[in-house]
Amino acid sequence: KIYTFILSACLLLVCSACHEASHHLLLGGSGWDKIAIVNKNTKEIEWEHPLEKGWECNSVAVTPDRNILFSYSKGAKLITRDHEEVWNISAPEGCEMQTARVLSNGNYLLAWCGNPATIMEVNAKGEILSKTDFDTRIEQPHAQFRQVNKNKRGNYLVPLFATSEIREISPSGQLLKSVKVDGNPFSVAALDNCNYLVACGDAHCFIELNFETGDIVR
C-alpha cells in the first residue's frame, strides 16, 4: 500500500554538538500508523509516535518549544517528545479535524470540516483565542479541506477538495475571494514573492498561484 504523506512536511533544523545544522523531516500521512522524525542524511527514523487505527493525520508541526502538534480526524493534540499529552481538542461528532499548524505569532491554527466548518486559533495552553464558523457549501465533511492557512492580512485560505478552489475567509466567516485551481487542493503556502504554492492533491502536481489575479504562474 502506498501512503500519501503530508505534502507540507516540516523541515527542521537541529543543531548538533558541533553546531552544524542537520536536516530532518517531520512526517505524517493519511493511512500511516505513526508520525515520525526522519534524518535526511541517514534516512533513519529518529523519533516516532504511534497513531490509533482509523486516525487520519493530515497535519503535523513542530512548535517553538519542540513539542509536536498534529491533527487526527477526531481532534488535535499537542504532545511532548516523551509522548506526554499537553492538551487535546476534540472535533464535534460528525466533523473531521484536518488542520493543525503553528502560526508566526506562536499560536496554533486548528480547523475541522463540518456543517458549519470551524477554524480556531489557540495558544500553547490549548486555550481558544478565536473561533470562525463558515459554510463551505459542501455537504460531506470529508470532501471539504485538509490544510487551512492564514495570510498576512489575517484572513484564512481554505483549499477545498470538492470544488477545486482556494477561498479566502475573514475571521468573521465572510467569503472574500475564491480562485479555481486544478485537482483537489490539499495545502497552500505563501512564497517570498507573495504568490502561493498549492499542492493539488489527486492532480499530482504543485502550482504557483497569484491569488490576487487568479493566474497560475507555473
Regions found by a protein language model. Give the residues of each.
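Short intrinsically disordered, low-complexity coil segments enriched in acidic
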Residues: 1-5, 216-217
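Bacterial Sec-dependent signal peptides at the C-terminal "C-region" and cleavage site
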Residues: 3, 7-22
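Secretory-pathway ectodomains
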Residues: 21-218
